[in-house]
Amino acid sequence: EGFQLMDRGTFDEIGR
């Protein structure tokens, strides 16, 4: 994961 700021499902596709 790349973005662990908000939900792991929200930025899942962005911080893949």
Swiss-Prot record:
Keywords: Allergen, Calcium, Motor protein, Muscle protein, Myosin, Phosphoprotein, Repeat. GO terms for cellular component: myosin complex. Disulfide bonds: none annotated. This chain binds calcium. Myosin is a hexamer of 2 heavy chains and 4 light chains. This is Myosin light chain. It comes from Penaeus monodon. The lineage of its organism: Eukaryota, Metazoa, Ecdysozoa, Arthropoda, Crustacea.
